[in-house]
A protein has these predicted regions:
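Catalytic glycan-binding domains that act on GlcNAc-containing polysaccharides
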Residues: 27-199
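Bacterial N-terminal signal peptides
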Residues: 9-17
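Bacterial N-terminal signal peptides that target proteins for export
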Residues: 1-8
Length: 199
């Protein structure tokens, strides 16, 4: 009877143990087929219509954002993504999640579109970007997006390309909700991207 209970218990617990394997539980981008397909495109995903898609998505999430500003930001996102080898839709998603596309956003010492914590990076940012020497410099949209894309690229490199772990680093702590929201944003942009490509 005792052994039968142990056997039954192990049978019931096995699926739970399998779910807790690294890379399975809480996996968002690393196993998402849409993200992996876009990743396989390399720099091609930075070509048109990526900028149009991002501009449209920015205005969906922030209707008060002027059309020209959305267009300008989207072009900077695509250029920064190409420069640092990251996914432009991932960068755009971070911008929406972190600041709702507001260049003057400020929260708990984090600044700008990509909510970069100046106190944590005030030594490393000027080394990589000599023209950025203050919070005022960091808040300029082009600077902020380039620094954010650069940081994301560094986190990806340190985490062997694992996006979920890199997003945890970007946020500063593991967050299922953060990654889940970003993946939802990503899927929306991919949907817009395919519509643009086929129209």
């Amino acid at each position: 009877m005792f052994f039968r209970r142990i056997l039954l218990l192990s049978f019931l617990l096995t699926p739970l143990l399998l779910l807790s394997e690294p890379g399975e539980a809480g996996s968002f981008f690393d196993n998402d087929r849409y993200f992996l397909t876009m990743r396989s495109l390399g720099d091609a995903k930075c070509a048109s219509p990526a900028d149009k898609v991002i501009a449209r998505f920015f205005r969906e999430k922030n209707p008060k954002l002027p059309r020209e500003t959305a267009k300008k930001y989207s072009q900077i996102v695509v250029e920064a993504a190409r420069e640092f080898g990251v996914d432009p839709f991932l960068v755009a998603g971070i911008i929406v999640k972190e600041s709702t596309v507001r260049a003057n956003a400020e929260s708990r010492g984090c600044y700008g579109l990509m909510q970069i914590k100046w106190s944590a990076h005030k030594k490393s940012i000027p080394k990589a970007f000599p023209s950025i020497r203050s919070v005022k410099d960091l808040q300029k949209p082009e600077n902020n997006i380039r620094v954010g894309a650069y940081m994301l690229a560094n986190f990806l490199r340190r985490n062997q390309g694992r996006v979920d772990a890199s997003l945890d680093r970007y946020k500063g702590s593991p967050s299922t909700k953060y990654k889940s929201t970003l993946l939802k944003y990503y899927h929306r942009m991919i949907s817009l991207y395919h519509k643009e490509k086929t129209s």
